[in-house]
Amino acid sequence: MGVLLTTGPTSPSRAASDASPPSPWVVRWSRLVAPGGTVLDVACGGGRHLGWFHARGHRVTGVDRSAEALRALAPLARAGAEIVKADLEDGPWPFAARTFDAVVVTNYLWRPLFPTIVAALAPGGVLICETFAAGNETVGRPARADFLLRPGELLTVCDDLHVVAYENGFLEAPARFVQRVAALRPKAEDASGIATGPPRHLLQTLSSDAVSAPMPRTGAR
């Protein structure tokens, strides 16, 4: 995490979030997380999402195997964030029997962990996941198939969840192929045994200006 220069006091969550901005996908679907709910950031790195959720009143937990990355999160830890050092690929899951209102995974892929991540969602909890996808080998790293999602793979991972949004495509600046999903674990039936009805998760729509804007011209006549 880079050095943050300020002219006044800075909160721990502000320092973490200012070092690197959160993913727009995470920001967009964070509204599915219950107010004040618990958030687990898997392979949290420098804590860009931990800081962002912490600043908005969520109880946050971050896990990563990099001691260097976690040392940078000391201010967040002092402010109440739970920071865990663990090797998720060569060790036990450190949150056995615990569930979270949201699990965030970005730019990280370890396929054997997917069932555990899904199981860590509390009823009504949301999985917000975004990482590199097949095609990225044509523009940069990662390029190995082990680190790239196959077409539709996240939909298979979320087979038992309610998928609210899914995208698989190309982004610019920097050029990369990504796949991403926002999916909810269904809530249990209420005490009377009657289901609460289908959830109503508002989707974003284009503004009228965007719809009416002329298409850019490509090539010469």
Model-derived features with residue positions:
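S-adenosyl-L-methionine
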Residues: G2-A34
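Conserved class I S-adenosyl-L-methionine
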Residues: G37-G45
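Conserved SAM-binding loop of SAM-dependent methyltransferases across substrates and taxa
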Residues: G46-R56
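Core SAM-dependent methyltransferase catalytic element
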Residues: L171-R221
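A short acidic, Gly/Pro-enriched loop at the edge of an enzyme's catalytic core
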Residues: W93-A102
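Conserved SAM/SAH-binding beta-strand->alpha-helix loop
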Residues: S66-E68
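Conserved beta-strand signature within the Rossmann-like core of class I S-adenosyl-L-methionine
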Residues: G125-F132
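Conserved SAM-binding strand-loop segment of SAM-dependent methyltransferases
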Residues: R78-D90
